[in-house]
Amino acid sequence: DRTPALRLRF
């Protein structure tokens, strides 16, 4: 998990 938003893809 890199960021709360990007964790949906990455």
Swiss-Prot record:
<dbReference type="GO" id="GO:0005576">
    <property type="term" value="C:extracellular region"/>
</dbReference>
<feature type="modified residue" description="Phenylalanine amide">
    <location>
        <position position="10"/>
    </location>
</feature>
<dbReference type="GO" id="GO:0007218">
    <property type="term" value="P:neuropeptide signaling pathway"/>
</dbReference>
<keyword id="KW-0527">Neuropeptide</keyword>
<keyword id="KW-0964">Secreted</keyword>
<comment type="similarity">
    <text>Belongs to the FARP (FMRFamide related peptide) family.</text>
</comment>
<protein>
    <recommendedName>
        <fullName>FMRFamide-like neuropeptide FLP5</fullName>
    </recommendedName>
</protein>
<keyword id="KW-0027">Amidation</keyword>
